Amino acid sequence: MKIGIITGASSGLGREFALQAFEYYDLDELWLAARREDAMRALAESMPDKVCRIFPCDLRDLAAIDTLIAAIETEKPEIRLLVNNAGLGYLDDFEKVDRDKDIAMCDVNMRAPTLLTAAAIPYMPRGAAIIFVSSIAAFAPNPRMSVYCSTKAYIQSLAKSLRYELAPRGVNVLALYPCPMNTEFLTVGGIEGRSRTFDKLPRCDPHKAARAALARAAKGKGSHTPLLLMKFYRFLAKVTPHNLIMPLSKT
């Protein structure tokens, strides 16, 4: 059985990945993992000619991650696509962020994709792909989103390392670096209307971002940064000392 796995699939970018995954990969089933079962069922019903399996799970919970991993190890599917999309981000001064929110960001943004990817790799054949959703926040430190940008820098490093490590096996790894999108992420994280930087940035289209990431991953590419302005920022962050970048990246 050939499958794809998408986390954070209930809305936004994850939903777009789910809607387009079958166009780029030969899949028998798509496994959807997210907290909201009703939203995933609605998504599955919008694709009546496709087979979707729903895993209601909160990736902040290690037991939920283990449930998904157990399904992989029990059924031993051929995993053609893994999209580590689920993520959390909160905006505030570092000492004001609730401890539980910091823990949640670390668990969802780092622990979950690390453990899920490690479990999936043994079942990925040549030609399979892993997509990690990072962020433009990975390019330079973001004051007032210190933990979030650190988790995304971790994902950037993990994706680059695994791309090199898995290349001999023919498994491609791509990191996607989107800028802010008009999704629930901005409201859930208390970002919308509270950040002079985010409020001024152009918005990334989730549909186009997912399509480009899937297409580039299928072609063996290693990264995608939507929008020309964000590509320039990525270059700027590479060549400019971060103490000069941070006044621009401060959220």
Q: Locations of the language-model features?
A:
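Substrate-binding pocket helix/loop in short-chain dehydrogenase/reductase
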Residues: 93-94, 101-104
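Conserved NAD(P)H cofactor-binding loop of Rossmann-fold oxidoreductase domains
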Residues: 85-90
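Conserved glycine-rich cofactor-binding loop
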Residues: 10-11
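C-terminal helical subdomain
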Residues: 175, 196-233
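Active-site helix of classical SDR
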Residues: 117, 151
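Residue(s) in the substrate-gating loop at a strand-loop-helix junction
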Residues: 135
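Conserved glycine-rich Rossmann-like NAD(P)H-binding loop of the short-chain dehydrogenase/reductase
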Residues: 24-42
